[in-house]
Design a protein with these regions (language model features):
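Post-HEXXH active-site segment of zinc metalloproteases
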Residues: 32, 65-93, 107-111
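Long, well-structured alpha-helical subdomains associated
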Residues: 47-50, 98-131
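Auxiliary, metal-adjacent structural segments of Zn-dependent hydrolase domains
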Residues: 1-39, 49-50, 97
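C-terminal capping/extension segments of zinc metalloprotease domains
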Residues: 35-42, 64, 124-131
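Active-site recognition of the HExxH zinc-binding catalytic motif
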Residues: 54-67
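Secondary-structure capping and boundary motifs in well-ordered enzyme cores
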Residues: 45, 49-53, 83
Length: 131
């Protein structure tokens, strides 16, 4: 997606408003989510790479659910199912607050092919269930 896409603009404004920094910069090598990396408690968005706007909210969710004392040094998302669930729940709440469609957040290319199932579960008010 482009930086000027309406969803991207809305998400970037929301993250700025709540104090999660997003900078534009080059990402060397592969990142877990295309074009986005957690670095020093903020997000780096590589405008030269394709990315999904909803992934910005998901990665911001990892920052948001991290202990505030640990955020400034956060550079890697832990492989923790509980943290992943918390980041998913936070990103859904953030999408609602920012006026972002559930299917922009839980897109078809993400969540190991389970984006539609997550979107449907949250739209029903159920959420994904326990880890």
């Amino acid at each position: 997606m482009a930086l000027d896409h309406p969803d991207t603009v809305r998400i970037l404004a929301f993250l700025d408003e709540i104090g999660i920094p997003v900078s534009r910069g080059r990402i060397e090598g592969e990142s877990f989510l295309p074009g986005i990396e957690v670095r020093s408690g903020g997000l780096v968005l590589d405008p030269a790479r394709p990315f999904h706007p909803g992934d910005l909210l998901h990665e911001a969710g990892h920052i948001a659910v991290t202990d505030p004392a640990d955020r400034p040094t956060l550079c890697e998302v832990r492989d923790d199912p509980g943290e992943e669930m918390a980041a998913i729940a936070w990103s859904y709440a953030a999408a609602r607050a920012a006026g972002i469609d559930t299917r922009t957040l839980f897109h078809a290319d993400g969540y190991l092919g389970g984006g539609e199932a997550l979107a449907a579960a949250f739209d029903r008010g159920a959420g994904p269930g326990p880890p």
